[in-house]
Each structure stands twice: as structure tokens, then as C-alpha cells.
A protein has these predicted regions:
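Extended, loop-rich substrate-binding clefts of extracytoplasmic carbohydrate-active enzymes
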Residues: 86-143, 154-161
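C-terminal motif of bacterial Sec signal peptides marking the signal peptidase cleavage site
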Residues: 16-18
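Bacterial lipoprotein signal-peptidase II cleavage site
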Residues: 20-24
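A recognition module on extended beta-rich or small alphabeta surfaces enriched in W/G with H and D/E
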Residues: 178-212
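Acidic-aromatic substrate-binding/catalytic surfaces of carbohydrate-active enzymes
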Residues: 39-111, 121
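Bacterial N-terminal signal peptides that target proteins for export
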Residues: 1-8
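Beta-strand-rich recognition/accessory modules
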Residues: 26-47, 56, 202-274
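Acidic (Asp/Glu-rich), glycine- and aromatic
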Residues: 141-181
Length: 274
């Protein structure tokens, strides 16, 4: 009889354990990004993404979704251009009193970093350029990452770029949404205007159940440009062709939305501003 009771209780015990939700946390570890060329990185794991933040350059080398797909595809190999070394986020300072906040490639100048906050729901890492003129703050939350340019070199400008590969590689049937239009735009469709407030854009792959989004927390009247470079996206807040327009401290978000429906993406992005 005792044996019968024991066996009868096992399914109940298994069900209880299986249905117990696991806590959602933001965790920080350290390691190499092999896909980027063995670069030393902060590795930040959240419930929706894994971010590889390269320690010397101060930019992302990889952003993995929950299926392990990398939506950046950076590699430091010299000469790889759009197929590797140009990719990343935020890639913000280029020939503007230095070249900073880009995963380390042949043209990236070095920065130093410090972890300022490390809790279960918030990690903050601050990078300072070698010339002390630029400072960028990374804040990682359960559902997104915020990048804030907290210090701008006087008289210089920057942009915030997503140069990546939706769904792991660029395909002709990839697409994007934005705050300017609720209809999906083909990946070849360019954009050269100021996005309406709240300024956001999201990129998707028809085979993926999610999209990667970028959000500008402050509204402005500066251009936001997108063009398809065949091997990667080139989207920039404060960018038109090769001109930079941002010159004050501002905040931007990047992350995944587990949907490809416009209204759900719009709602998720707007919640990030609350």
C-alpha cells in the first residue's frame, strides 16, 4: 500500500515541479565571442536575448534571440566589410574626434569600461573613450537594452546604427516596420525622413516569429535613414547618407519583440517609454 501511494504521488510531484515558473533575471558573465573572432566580451543574458558587448570597442558583436540566432553577424576579419567588420550596434562615433562604440575591428579605437550596477533585473556598464571625450552607458533590463550617449565631444556629432542581419542573414523577403507606416516594407525599401514620434523601426524575417526593434526615446526633427547594403541593414537614427546629426546626450533601445504583428510591436515599443 505504501508503494502504491508512492507511485501515485510521483506524477503530482512532477507536475508541480514542471509548472513552477522559473524566475526571470538579467545575468552578467564574461567570455569570448567565437563567431566574432574570439573577442573578449561582457555576456548579458535576459529572458529575450543574449548580448555580447565587446570589452575594448564598447559595441555589440552579437545579439542572439531565444533560438540562438544572431541578428548582427559581426566578424573582425579585415576586408570583410558589409559581410562582417562593418556590422554591429551602435557604431556611433566614426571619424568624429575618434572612432568609438563599435565592436573591435581594424578601425575601432579603444575605450575603458566599468560595471556600475549588477542586480537580478538591471545591469549597467559604462564605457569611456580613450580620449575622455565620449561616454556611453549601457542599461540591460529583462526585455531590452538601453544605450545612452551620456557625454558628447563638443563640436562633434554622432549617429546610432543597426548594421545587422534580420533572422541571421539578409534575404530578399526580409521586411521592416516603423512608426511612419503600419504596412510591412520590403527590405530594399529605403527611408530618408525623420521618423514620427515615438521614433522606432523593427526588422523581421518571414521565417522568424519575432522582430528586432530600435527606439529613440527623444523626439527630434533630424533625419533617420535606412538603406539595404545587400549583406546587411544600414539604419541610423540621426543619419542621412553619410552625414551625422546628433550632438546631445540621448537614449536608444534595442531588443526583440516576440511578434510580427504591427499593433503588438507598436504597443511593446511604446511601453518601453513609460
Amino acid at each position: 500500500m505504501k508503494r502504491l501511494l508512492c507511485f501515485a504521488s510521483l506524477p503530482l510531484l512532477f507536475l508541480t515541479l514542471a509548472c513552477t515558473p522559473q524566475p526571470s533575471t538579467v545575468s552578467l558573465s564574461h567570455g569570448l565571442d567565437a563567431s566574432a573572432g574570439e573577442l573578449d566580451c561582457y555576456i548579458i543574458s535576459t529572458e529575450t536575448a543574449t548580448y555580447y558587448l565587446e570589452k575594448q570597442g564598447g559595441g555589440f558583436s552579437s545579439i542572439l534571440d531565444v533560438d540562438g540566432v544572431d541578428w548582427l553577424g559581426f566578424h573582425k576579419k579585415p576586408g570583410s566589410a558589409h559581410k562582417g567588420e562593418y556590422r554591429g550596434f551602435p557604431n556611433s562615433i566614426h571619424n568624429q574626434d575618434g572612432n568609438y562604440f563599435h565592436a573591435l575591428n581594424a578601425g575601432t579605437e579603444l575605450s575603458t569600461s566599468v560595471v556600475e550596477i549588477e542586480t537580478d533585473d538591471h545591469i549597467r556598464i559604462v564605457f569611456t573613450s580613450a580620449n575622455k571625450k565620449w561616454e556611453g552607458r549601457w542599461d540591460f533590463h529583462l526585455d531590452r537594452c538601453d544605450f545612452t550617449m551620456t557625454k558628447v565631444s563638443p563640436g562633434y556629432k554622432y549617429w546610432i546604427l543597426y548594421e545587422g542581419v534580420p533572422g541571421g542573414e539578409m534575404d530578399a523577403d526580409d521586411f521592416w516596420y516603423s512608426s511612419a507606416n503600419d504596412q510591412p516594407q520590403p527590405i530594399d525599401q529605403t527611408y530618408t525622413e525623420d521618423l514620427p514620434s515615438p521614433e522606432w523601426i523593427a526588422f523581421g524575417d518571414p521565417d522568424a516569429p519575432r522582430m528586432i526593434y530600435l527606439l529613440h526615446h527623444e523626439d527630434d526633427d533630424q533625419p533617420d535613414g535606412y538603406i539595404n547594403r545587400a549583406d546587411m541593414t544600414v539604419f541610423g537614427f540621426g543619419r542621412l547618407e553619410k552625414e551625422k546629426y546628433l550632438d546631445t546626450p540621448q537614449t536608444f533601445s534595442i531588443g526583440f519583440v516576440e511578434s510580427t504583428e504591427y499593433k503588438k510591436i507598436e504597443h511593446f515599443v511604446e511601453q518601453s517609454l513609460e
